[in-house]
Amino acid sequence: MRIVLDTNVLVAGLLYVRRPPGRVLDLVLGGSVVLLWDDRLLEEYAEVLARPKFAFGRADVRALLDYLRLAGEFTVSQPLDLPRQIKVPDPQDLPFAEVAVVSRADALVTGNARHFAFLPRFGIQAMTPASFLLRWQEDASRGRA
């Protein structure tokens, strides 16, 4: 499966390794799931992970981002053509949606699924980490993960 990972899930996955975000991150790091990215997403990951409140080591963050860059799939994204009546709660979420749509991701995994309520019109589903894990397990049991 190919996914876009919202920054909130990446951070939660590093902080709470046994909870659903951590298990999703394990799937990415283990190669069972392919992370889709563009430079804007990796820049946001870097900026957020560097915040002092998380206390992640700079070398660890650099190593993680290098791995995600190498193991993931780079996407050249484009702005979404959204009708005016669609309101995006957080415009900083748009790069994640754009990567998901252009790359035809299987899912955008986020802790804020309601921020991406417009994605189904593009054939993309925003899922919580727990929902994604259920779908991944179902697909794996059918040999499609």
Question: What are these model-predicted stretches?
Answer:
Residues 48, 53-86:
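Helix-adjacent hinge/juxtasegments
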Residues 70-107, 113:
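Active-site neighborhoods of divalent-metal-dependent phosphate/nucleic-acid chemistry enzymes
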Residues 14-15, 49, 120, 137:
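Short, flexible helix/strand-to-coil boundary loops that buttress conserved ligand/catalytic motifs
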Residues 6-7, 37-38, 112, 128:
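A secondary-structure boundary/capping signal
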Residues 94, 101-107, 113-145:
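Acidic, PIN/NYN-like endoribonuclease modules and their adjacent C-terminal/linker elements
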Residues 4-5, 15, 21-52:
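PIN/NYN-family metal-dependent endoribonuclease catalytic core
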Residues 19, 36, 59, 87, ...:
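Residues at secondary-structure transition points
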